[in-house]
Amino acid sequence: MLDIKRIRTDFEAVAEKLATRGVDAAVLNEMKEIDAKRRNILVKVETLKAERNTVSAEIAQAKRNKENTDDKIAAMQNLSAEVKALDAELAEIDAKLTEFTTTLPNIPADSVPVGTDEDDNVEVRRWGTPREFDFEPKAHWDLGEDLGILDWERGGKVTGARFLFYKGLGARLERAIYNFMLDEHGKEGYTEVITPYIVNHDSMFGTGQYPKFKEDTFELSDTNFVLIPTAEVPLTNYYRDEILDGKDLPIYFTAMSPSFRSEAGSAGRDTRGLIRLHQFHKVEMVKFAKPEESYEELEKMTANAENILQKLNLPYRVVALSTGDMGFSTAKTYDLEVWIPAQNNYREISSCSNTEDFQARRAQIRYRDEADGKVKLLHTLNGSGLAVGRTVAAILENYQNEDGSVTIPEALRPYMGGAEVIKP
């Protein structure tokens, strides 16, 4: 959530920044007018309350003097009625301002490339060289079916489209991947957490999914509960409405969880395979940091995600998202895109973001600065470390052999019970 004071005092700069995110200037101008009206009403209310206090004192004095107070009582009643009417108007204005501030996206950092969509993203670096096959590489969905480790047909029968069963070494591979990821993040100082997989609406508001993106979630009917779209939600809300000790920052959390997404805006995209599912496992990283340290922490988090891909020897690239492609809550995002041979393309496998104080303001996560003792909003960061299903897809395709088998990456073999190859 944006700081209304910043919008008020630095309106032109904020409007210019948000315009790069597709926010119409008319929206901000309307917000500015409503805010000005609110401040004018506040002045009127304070003036009327002061007058009312004066009249009240005069009534008390008149009663002590045994004078008639009818006119003064009538005047005070009129003043009270005016205050009540203005308070009601203020409540309506505050609701409108809240609607504005909770639905406007975050202000992009100065280092974010300006653009309208993913075509304007900027590649930062690449790692690894895509493998050259001397045979036609198969898509991971065909490999998974041929190996008998991924079953979309029965997933569709039991549930519906974009669901599947992992079987045998496929299930073992999925488990090996997320255990490996959690172990690697643990080495980097992350505290492993098992979170609830259901959260309440306040938690969804805190991280920015609600109210703007309700259609993308799975709500439990007639309850205050939602299936988590990512472990970012429970991990970030862990400290909602709390004041942390500044000396304890930064704090690192990691968690593996299922993620549930309706993919309401993705009809027709990636209808086959593991790239876009309604339910998938993901290892998440979340950080709580002081504002002056958060961008250094973003670089470290991105490196933590890269470490996984490097140890799995999967070629990838790092991309800085443009203002038009960033998520709602983020001030800056790096995407990690892994090479998918059958698509001859890099596909997103991780997003690492600094939301600055956007989520912290919504969730009221603060810290007491040990230097001056003041309570301040901290910065929150989140990143995929990594999306597990997409990692399975990348391994199947990059490690496939001409006979249809798939070699298991060396880093995962200690987690695979001695298996080195998945064979038909």
Swiss-Prot record:
InterPro entries documented for this protein: aa-tRNA-synt_IIb (IPR002314), aa-tRNA-synth_II (IPR006195), aa-tRNA-synth_II/BPL/LPL (IPR045864), Ser-tRNA-ligase_type_1 (IPR002317), Ser-tRNA-synth_1_N (IPR015866), SerRS_1_N_sf (IPR042103), SerRS_core (IPR033729), tRNA-bd_arm (IPR010978)
Protein EC: 6.1.1.11
Predominant place of localization: cytoplasm
SUPFAM superfamilies noted in UniProt: Class II aaRS and biotin synthetases, tRNA-binding arm
Pathway: Aminoacyl-tRNA biosynthesis; selenocysteinyl-tRNA(Sec) biosynthesis; L-seryl-tRNA(Sec) from L-serine and tRNA(Sec): step 1/1
Keywords in alphabetical order: Aminoacyl-tRNA synthetase, ATP-binding, Cytoplasm, Ligase, Nucleotide-binding, Protein biosynthesis
Top enzyme category: ligase
Binding annotation for L-serine: 230-232, 284, 384
Name of one Pfam family that matches: Seryl_tRNA_N
PROSITE patterns: AA_TRNA_LIGASE_II
Binding site for ATP: 261-263, 348-351
Entry's Gene Ontology molecular function annotations: ATP binding; catalytic activity, acting on a protein; serine-tRNA ligase activity; transferase activity
A single Gene Ontology CC term: cytoplasm
Superkingdom of the source species: Bacteria
Keyword Endoplasmic reticulum carried by entry: no
GO biological process terms, semicolon-separated: selenocysteine biosynthetic process; seryl-tRNA aminoacylation
Catalytic activity from the UniProt record: tRNA(Ser) + L-serine + ATP = L-seryl-tRNA(Ser) + AMP + diphosphate + H(+); tRNA(Sec) + L-serine + ATP = L-seryl-tRNA(Sec) + AMP + diphosphate + H(+)
Recorded domain comment: Consists of two distinct domains, a catalytic core and a N-terminal extension that is involved in tRNA binding.
PANTHER family cross-referenced by the UniProt entry: SERINE--TRNA LIGASE (PTHR43697:SF1), SERYL-TRNA SYNTHETASE (PTHR43697)
Similarity section: Belongs to the class-II aminoacyl-tRNA synthetase family. Type-1 seryl-tRNA synthetase subfamily.
Quaternary structure and partners: Homodimer. The tRNA molecule binds across the dimer.
Known role: Catalyzes the attachment of serine to tRNA(Ser). Is also able to aminoacylate tRNA(Sec) with serine, to form the misacylated tRNA L-seryl-tRNA(Sec), which will be further converted into selenocysteinyl-tRNA(Sec).
Protein name (Swiss-Prot/TrEMBL): Serine--tRNA ligase
Species this chain originates from: Streptococcus pneumoniae (strain JJA)
Gene for this chain: serS
